[in-house]
C-alpha cells in the first residue's frame, strides 16, 4: 500500500449532505462530493489488511484495497479498471449501497471510522466518465441469443455481462423505461435518473436491445431465444389488511415514489390520479429505507408533518450491535438524510384500523406494544402496552416490504436472477446475482 500508516493520522471525512433548508426545496441529489485531494487522502486510509473483510462483506467481491490504493496514488484509470472488474455499474452502488464493506472494515472494529469506500467508489466512476475511461465496447457475436425479462439491477447486469460475452441480448421491460426500482422506487434525491440514462445509452450502443411496455408472462416466454433470464423483481408489496384499508389516502409506498419519479421525468397525472402530501399530516408505516424515502418525498411535496411507525422494537443506538458483532452488519439505529429533514419516529406500534370520514382517511388507530419471550421458543409474543391511540393522518404510506414471488417450474434454459429468486434485497445483491446468473447462462450455452 502507498501509505500504510495513513489511518493513524488522517481521520475519516465524509462529503456530507446539502443544507436541509436548501435540499428540501428540490429533488436534486442530497449528497455532496469531496475535492480530489481530500478524496485521495481518504483512499490512503485503507490499510494493508492481512484479511480484507471489506472484500468478504461485499456481495460483488469488490477489490476495495486495490482501487483505494490506486486512487491514493492518483491513478484514477487503474482505480476504475479494478472497480469495474467486479462491479458493472458502480455509479449506482456508489450512491445507494448501504456499504456492507465499510461495516466490515478493520478500522470500523478499531475506532468506528472505516474507510469511505462507497464515496470513493462513486468518485472513481464519475471521474472515469468525465475523463472518457468508460468506452463503448462492441463484442464479437457468437451467434446465440438471450432474452432478459425485467430491466432492474439484476437484469441489466446480466444483460451487460452476456452482451460482453458475445450473445445477442434483448431486454423486455413491462414499464416505459429501464431501471426497475432504481428508476421507479429510489427518489431522485438519492439517485438522479440521468445517471441511469447515461448507462442505458452505453448499453444500447454496445448492442443490447430494449423493448419497453412489454408485459411478459413468465410461463409464456417469447420464442426464438437460446436462453432466458427472468429478473422481474418483487412486484407485490406487503399489504396491511385492517379495517378502513379501502379509504382514499391509504397507499403503498411505491405509489408515491414511482409517481413522483415519473412526474420529474415529465409525465402528467390528473388531479384524481395524483398522490400528494402537500399540506397533509403524513404517516409512514414501516421503518426501512423505503419508508425513509417516503419521508424525504413528503417533505419535498410540502407536507404538514411526517410520522414514521414501526411494529418492531427500536434498534440499538450507537455503532455496535452486541448481538451481531463485527464484521457482520450491525442491526443498529439508522438515521437517513430524510430523517434529518424532520420526522417523528416511533417503535413498537401496531396499526389497528384506518379511520375516515366521507370515504377519506383522517387518522390511524394504533396500539403500543411490547415483545415478550415466547416460552415455547420461536418468534417473541406481541403484548399490549398501554391504551390505543389515534395518529392524525390524511395520507398513509405502507412501506412494509415485498412478498417473495413464487416462480413456476422452468425449463433448463431459463434462469432466475435478483429479487425474483431471493425475494426483496439490496441492489448490490441483485447486481451480484445478475453476474452469477450470466455466468451460469454462459456455461449452459457452451456445454
What are these regions (language model features)?
Residues 48-73, 93-124, 170, 174-177, ...:
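Iron-sulfur cluster-binding cysteine motifs and their immediate structural context
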Residues 45-51, 88, 421-427:
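Glycine-rich phosphate/pyrophosphate-binding beta-alpha loops
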